[in-house]
UniProtKB/Swiss-Prot annotation:
<feature type="transmembrane region" description="Helical">
    <location>
        <begin position="4"/>
        <end position="24"/>
    </location>
</feature>
<protein>
    <recommendedName>
        <fullName>Fluoride-specific ion channel FluC</fullName>
    </recommendedName>
</protein>
<feature type="transmembrane region" description="Helical">
    <location>
        <begin position="104"/>
        <end position="124"/>
    </location>
</feature>
<feature type="binding site">
    <location>
        <position position="78"/>
    </location>
    <ligand>
        <name>Na(+)</name>
    </ligand>
</feature>
<keyword id="KW-1003">Cell membrane</keyword>
<comment type="function">
    <text>Fluoride-specific ion channel. Important for reducing fluoride concentration in the cell, thus reducing its toxicity.</text>
</comment>
<keyword id="KW-0406">Ion transport</keyword>
<dbReference type="GO" id="GO:0005886">
    <property type="term" value="C:plasma membrane"/>
</dbReference>
<dbReference type="Pfam" id="PF02537">
    <property type="entry name" value="CRCB"/>
</dbReference>
<feature type="transmembrane region" description="Helical">
    <location>
        <begin position="71"/>
        <end position="91"/>
    </location>
</feature>
<keyword id="KW-0479">Metal-binding</keyword>
<feature type="binding site">
    <location>
        <position position="81"/>
    </location>
    <ligand>
        <name>Na(+)</name>
    </ligand>
</feature>
<keyword id="KW-0813">Transport</keyword>
<keyword id="KW-0812">Transmembrane</keyword>
<dbReference type="GO" id="GO:0062054">
    <property type="term" value="F:fluoride channel activity"/>
</dbReference>
<feature type="transmembrane region" description="Helical">
    <location>
        <begin position="38"/>
        <end position="58"/>
    </location>
</feature>
<comment type="similarity">
    <text>Belongs to the fluoride channel Fluc/FEX (TC 1.A.43) family.</text>
</comment>
Length: 127
């Protein structure tokens, strides 16, 4: 497969991931308000869960073709999850003096995202 094909697969997944991140973030704002970065937390936890499933699928040979790795792993999940927005959310909380919310955001993103990845991985590895 040529480099152009690889880039095309990544771009396709990235387009869906970016649109999904926007829609999930907007839904979180509608449902929960703007007082906490729920959207960023949600996309990071969901993306980590899907990545756990994806890695287990590759290890168990359920889905090992390169196009799927590129579409889902690099493209979709790369665009869905966001470390830069997570970082900026924390800078803004710090500027507002909302240190408790900032600490909670860091803790929740790290603990829930790692837990979600582990749960996703375990779900497929045990089946």
């Amino acid at each position: 497969m040529g480099q152009l094909s690889v880039l095309g697969f990544i771009a396709l997944g990235g387009a869906f991931g970016a649109c999904s991140r926007y829609l999930i973030s907007e839904l979180c704002v509608m449902l929960l308000g703007r007082g906490f970065p729920y959207g960023t937390l949600t996309v990071n936890v969901v993306g980590s869960f899907i990545m756990g499933l994806l890695i287990a699928a590759f290890e168990t040979e359920l889905m090992v073709t390169d196009p799927w790795r590129q579409i889902i792993g690099l493209g979709f999940l790369g665009a869905l999850t966001t470390f830069s927005t997570f970082s900026m959310d924390n800078v803004l909380l710090m500027q507002q003096g909302a240190f408790f919310k900032m600490g909670l955001n860091v803790l929740l993103n790290v603990v829930l995202s790692i837990s979600a990845a582990w749960i996703g991985f375990q779900l497929l590895m045990r089946s």
